[in-house]
Amino acid sequence: MNNSKDNPFRGAIARKARIYLREGLDCVYFLNKAGQAEPCPACTSLVFQGKTCEEHIHNNNLLSWQAVKQLEKQTPQRQSLN
């Protein structure tokens, strides 16, 4: 599954992501460089195969559902104009 060039934590990240999806997340989220939760639909489908997408192959900043919810609360929501 992992070759020597891969992140050695890639399988563990995928296992953790599967748990977070079972706990209520609709998508796998990583922390981006701006400190925001960034969804990754590609990783969401790959974690059930024990993998992450190429973009996140070296990113260990997987966010739990609690962290995603907390970041959503801290980020001001746009008000829709009616």
Swiss-Prot record:
InterPro entries: Acc_prot_5b_avian_CoV. Keywords: Eukaryotic host gene expression shutoff by virus, Host gene expression shutoff by virus, Host-virus interaction, Inhibition of host innate immune response by virus, Interferon antiviral system evasion, Viral immunoevasion. GO terms for biological process: symbiont-mediated suppression of host gene expression; symbiont-mediated suppression of host innate immune response. The keyword Aminoacyl-tRNA synthetase does not apply. Transmembrane segments: none annotated. Changing L81S: In strain: Isolate Vero cell-adapted and Isolate Vero cell-adapted p65. Involved in host translation shutoff without degradating host RNA. By suppressing host gene expression, facilitates the evasion from host type I interferon immune response. This is Host translation inhibitor 5b.
